[in-house]
Amino acid sequence: MLISQLKKFDAYPKTVDDFRVKTYTGAIVSIIGGVFILWLFFSQVTLYFSTDIHHELFVDTTRGEKLKINMDITFHHLPCAYLSLDAMDVSGEHQFDVAHNIFKKRLSPTGQPIIEAPPIREEEINKKESVKDNNDVVGCGSCYGAEDPSKGIGCCNTCEEVRVAYSKKGWGLDPSGIPQCIREGFTKNLVEQNGEGCQVYGFILVNKVAGNFHFAPGKSFQQHHMHVHDLQPFKDGSFNVSHTINRLSFGNDFPGIKNPLDDVTKTEMVGVGMFQYFVKVVPTIYEGLNGNRIATNQYSVTEHYRLLAKKGEEPSGLPGLFFMYDLSPIMMKVSERGKSFASFLTNVCAIIGGVFTVFGIFDSFIYYSTKNLQKKIDLGKTF
């Protein structure tokens, strides 16, 4: 009795097979509907295994962290012996002639590496310049008027020590007239590398505040609270700052990151100038599907070129490549999110039911339209 009453709840009543009519158009519509269902199903499978990227913005509350700046820049017409990398920020911290974690590779005028040996670490170059032929020097070498016992400058046995003593006095150094520099081959290196290019790569660590770093010819020092580059050794004054930024990033990379300055090439044609890039750094946290978090940065950039002198003229400023960066107070969180299986199952059921219903209506429309048309044709033949 209970089982017979249960039949009343059947939402899918069945018809007798004898009352079912199968047609060619119905078969075609069914095949098309099946193909459509399969296409939508595989689309949902692809979508299920893909990830969505969500962005959130909030105030950056981090303090006291360091900012890592990764760089790989090729100077097509500036020798490695000419280049100096300096960094400074609004907190007053200065890094002169940065050498730690910076490498330089000499390039031929055609852009090919000149030597096959491993690239020379910049701090090793400076160390080598400081101690080269030190054993050959007896006693206390002259600083040529730049001695200052109050600052601990009494003897200058190397070219680097003479340069430091001169920079303390605010004097320019002509290495061609300094025996220490002649002995170490400083001027000879400048002459030998003339016409070459240089690839500079590595990274620097700076305070997480606004600042700038730049590549410019000559050794740098501070005089009367001003940042100065000694261009005395480069008497011709012809500095071509044409360059290619192979890579420039602030922090670690994450999937999908786009650095707007990567593979950017600038060519100097009319004279000596200053390339300036104004960078807005946005602190970013990337969170993957596995929960791993990467604290890094993204950035946007605007650029400006300032012509300092036409060819053959004296530059009215310091030629070079300058990056002025500022940090946004807003932090961005980039999160990967996957699809839930329940959502996938719901979409698949909706696809199958929806396509089956729509194509069923379409098949019924074709069947009854054809049947009515056939009746009218038969009725016309009768009369």
Swiss-Prot record:
Membrane topology designation: Multi-pass membrane protein
Record's protein name: Probable endoplasmic reticulum-Golgi intermediate compartment protein 3
Sequence intervals crossing the membrane: 27-47, 348-368
Function: Possible role in transport between endoplasmic reticulum and Golgi.
Record topological domains on the Cytoplasmic side: 1-26, 369-383
Pfam family, one: COPIIcoated_ERV
Record topology, Lumenal segments: 48-347
Organism in which the protein naturally occurs: Dictyostelium discoideum
